């Protein structure tokens, strides 16, 4: 199926908060079920990249939806449960560090997005994807929106689902791999994480050997 990529919006003209305007415009064009799609975890040294697709019920949109990075952990958690209870459909997909190393983070992210869109229990008629890129082989048309999580409440909802899901995964990983502080930094390259890597070394299957600073030091693993 071909995909429509509209002219990307002016990122310097963001709304005060995400809204449902893009979705309403698409619904007027005949696209009833609009999926917002976002990712979390492109940059960390450890853990998966997680994507989510969310189709909101326009009559039950939770108050306060916003880019997950702009919300406190407590507010994200509250909205996470509100989205779970009110959305028409939610799908989550993740790809592990080893898969990221075998392809690259961009390809892995797009593949995870493709999987979560295709995994929606209510098939999407259209997808709004955060960022510049659109996955291939989608079951519906799609548009990429730069800073989409600050424009579309559907994308904002997806960012919250993906963020809370990934944080929970990394908290579980922290219980298994003691000493790395994964439950605190969730895999990002903090000073504490770098110090733990110096002390213990990376964990195969958890850490991304294709990412600096691991890439140069563990080049043999990647060969």
From Swiss-Prot:
Superkingdom to which the source organism belongs: Bacteria
Catalytic activity, as annotated: Endonucleolytic cleavage to 5'-phosphomonoester
Known EC number: 3.1.26.4
Top-rank EC class of the record's enzyme: hydrolase
One GO BP: mismatch repair
Disulfide-bonded cysteines: none
MF annotations from Gene Ontology: manganese ion binding; RNA binding; RNA-DNA hybrid ribonuclease activity
Primary role: Endonuclease that specifically degrades the RNA of RNA-DNA hybrids.
Family: Belongs to the RNase HII family.
Protein name from the UniProt record: Ribonuclease HII
Organism: Bartonella henselae (strain ATCC 49882 / DSM 28221 / CCUG 30454 / Houston 1)
Phylogenetic classification of the source organism: Bacteria, Pseudomonadati, Pseudomonadota, Alphaproteobacteria, Hyphomicrobiales
